[in-house]
Regions:
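An anion/pyrophosphate-binding glycine-rich loop and adjacent beta-alpha core
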Residues: 118, 344, 350-456, 517-519, ...
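Extreme N-terminal leader/targeting segments of oxidoreductases
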Residues: 1-88, 106-107
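Conserved redox-cofactor binding core of oxidoreductases
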Residues: 175-246, 285, 289-308, 313, ...
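Glycine- and aromatic-enriched mobile tails/lids
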Residues: 57, 69-86, 117-119, 124-130, ...
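Glycine-rich loop(s) and the adjacent beta-strand/alpha-helix scaffold that form part
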Residues: 316-370, 374, 502-513
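Glycine-rich active-site loop/strand segments that organize a redox cofactor
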Residues: 131-162
Length: 620
């Protein structure tokens, strides 16, 4: 490796030397052969046809080019190959990636990749805020709100961890310089959004994501052990040898599962043919599992805007590269978010989960301009904005879960033959509009609408992906050495439909847990200690048992009412009562009906609850 191309920390050197030797031994040594063997040529096997056109980079041409708003990577397989070594490589520079880096010690070398620029991430776009457990009494209601919004398909273990970690996360953000809104007494202000039973959302005007992400990015830029590479697109992961047979087998199972409509894909399975290799396998890179698994991630393969290929060897790898919105014609996401990690996972036989769980946000600004849809925050409705039909009448309860409100809007549009409905701010004081929602106010003026004087046209748009790469409570995938966090991952927090303002919190909590687990694997001490017990205690434990039992009961009832597992079957009359019952709004709701909903799947067999063991937990 040339000195200018390496980034080796004190611990990274050991991992790099072992991984490079292992990779070269696997791929016969030549860089070109290594690159060729590491990437599947031609068409990938993406989870959906929508991803096939814009997910993992195809290798043809010689430079990375931009076509409109969508990145069109073009790489020459015979281009220069540069080797980089580090302890941890993080793919993505949103809040999950940044917070993981901040929770790693300075003794570890870290490389972060941004597909375009560091500020082109969906974390920057989050408007409404970030949830927090308001007080001790809020645990059960926060938990139940999350379950109701998710149609009780949530993984209870993950919901519990997120809620109990929330206050320490907010405190840490404040210490790092995040400026949340406060009242005159200096206390945090809270707003409310759809399906929340009480205000529990911290915010910064209507640009909370920008405030959090920009602050974390500034802190990361101060770290001498972190290197950020912009305009660097991940093509594949690097793995140790003996992968071919097992991963090809699992990739075929994944593809078959997707084609058959099964949402939980095949995981790595035991293969007796690999036993001989396991016994004779060389030592794994630093940070590897002591059991020496037959297949282990040891970094990523990527390419840069100048056409160079990068082999980034790392002891631990984190995928934090966002969702799939770039594959949709109308989305609030950046066009560069095209499900790259999910496509690689499908090809590599890494478990995926709930690939059909896509959230449609009820209110994006209707516009004939091309490009990303502009989100109208749900907190607008939480503060009093209402949806109106063509006659100026309300037609639904605006504070129901997002999927319910989106369905109601769609039905209204069909009934009217219209391309949008209207959102009125008439119930909101002007200073609240221009203060709390100043960014939305400004953007609407650019489109010719003054929201202090008139309703604005809104339409549903793809917004969030609840599925993704399946991970455990520490954000680890089923491939050793590989983690996933943020919208890339599926830890089960959101169930079938995400509760408003849970995305930033979930990303931060589980990115931090990934960092802690990496530190354990790398033998390093995390700079921020865990402040909450691994399992709920006292009143929280009792609420946890009750809510998990309720979730199991609801999923059994829904499965019985809706028939066999069929995630596309509509069952409005049977499932309609499972949505959150928000407090009544003062205005009448002419024409409102129970929205159609999609029947939930049966609970995943691996969605284990701790109800049996929670009484034995020793509380910290």
């Amino acid at each position: 490796m040339s000195e200018e191309n390496e980034f080796v920390g004190e611990m990274g050197a050991v991992a790099a030397e072992t991984a490079i030797a292992e990779t070269n031994r696997t791929y016969a040594g030549a860089p070109e052969q290594a690159a060729a063997a590491s990437i599947t040529r031609g068409e990938a096997n993406p989870p959906t046809e929508a991803m096939a056109s814009a997910a993992v980079c195809a290798h043809s041409g010689d430079t990375c080019e931009s076509s409109g708003d969508r990145l069109q990577p073009k790489c020459d397989g015979a281009a220069e190959v540069r080797d980089i070594a580090c302890d941890v490589v993080i793919v993505g520079c949103g809040v999950a990636g940044l917070y993981c880096a901040l929770n790693l010690p300075s003794t570890l070398s870290v490389v972060m990749l941004a597909k375009t620029t560091v500020d082109e991430c969906d974390s920057m776009l989050a408007q409404g805020g970030i949830c927090v457990q308001h007080d001790d009494a809020d645990y059960a209601s926060f938990f139940e709100d999350t379950l109701r919004a998710g149609h009780y398909e949530n993984r209870c273990e993950s919901v519990d961890l997120m809620i109990r970690a929330s206050r320490s996360i907010i405190s840490d953000l404040v210490k790092r310089g995040v400026d949340f809104e406060r009242d005159k007494a200096g206390n945090l202000r809270y707003t409310r959004e759809g399906a929340h039973s009480r205000p529990r959302i911290c915010f910064h005007s209507d640009i909370t994501g920008d405030e959090i992400t920009s602050t974390l990015l500034a802190r990361v830029r101060e770290l001498p052990n972190v290197r950020i590479l912009e305009h660097t697109c991940m093509d594949d992961i690097l793995v140790t040898q003996a992968e071919a047979q097992v991963n090809a087998e699992n990739a075929a199972k994944n593809e078959a599962a997707v084609q058959s409509g099964t949402t939980q894909n095949a995981t790595n399975v035991e293969n007796q043919d690999c036993a001989a290799h396991d016994a004779a396998a060389p030592a794994t890179p630093r940070g590897g599992d002591s059991r020496q698994p037959r297949t282990r991630c040891c970094g990523v393969l990527a390419h840069t805007a100048d056409g160079a290929q990068l082999r980034i060897f790392a002891g631990q790898t984190l995928w934090a590269c966002g969702g799939i919105g770039g594959t949709y014609p109308r989305s609030t996401n950046f066009p560069s978010l095209t499900g790259d990690a999910c496509t690689i996972a499908a090809r590599r036989g890494i478990a995926l989960e709930h690939m059909d769980y896509v959230q449609i946000h009820p209110t994006s600004l209707y516009s004939t301009r091309p490009g990303r849809a502009f989100l109208i925050s749900e907190s607008c409705r939480g503060e009093g904005a209402v949806l109106l039909d063509a006659n100026g009448n309300r037609f639904t309860d605006e504070l129901q879960p997002r999927d319910v409100v989106s369905a109601a809007i769609y039905r209204q549009m069909v009934a009217e033959g219209s391309e949008f409905v209207r959102l009125s701010f008439a119930n909101m004081p002007k200073d609240e509009i221009t203060g709390h929602f100043k960014n939305i106010y400004k953007r609407c003026l650019e489109e010719g609408f003054d929201i202090t004087r008139e309703p604005i046209p809104v339409v549903p748009a793809q917004h969030y992906f609840m599925g993704g790469v399946r991970v455990d409570r520490n954000s680890a995938t089923d491939m050793p050495g590989l983690y996933a966090a943020g919208e890339t991952s599926c830890n089960g927090v959101h169930g079938k439909n995400r509760l408003a303002s849970n995305s930033l919190l979930e990303s931060l909590v589980f990115a931090q847990r990934a960092a802690w687990d990496m530190c354990r694997k790398l033998g390093a001490k995390a700079p921020v200690a865990q402040t909450y017990p691994e399992q709920p205690c006292g009143a929280d434990a009792q609420a946890y048992e009750r809510l998990c039992a309720e979730a199991k009961r609801k999923t059994r009832e829904n499965a019985a009412k809706c028939g066999p597992q069929n995630t596309t079957q509509t069952c409005a009359q049977n499932v309609g009562q499972n949505t959150a019952q928000t407090e009544p709004r003062s205005a009448e709701q002419p024409g409102s009906q129970t929205p159609a909903q999609t029947c939930p799947q049966n609970p995943s067999p691996s969605d284990t609850d701790r109800t049996a063991s929670s009484k034995e937990v020793v509380c910290a």
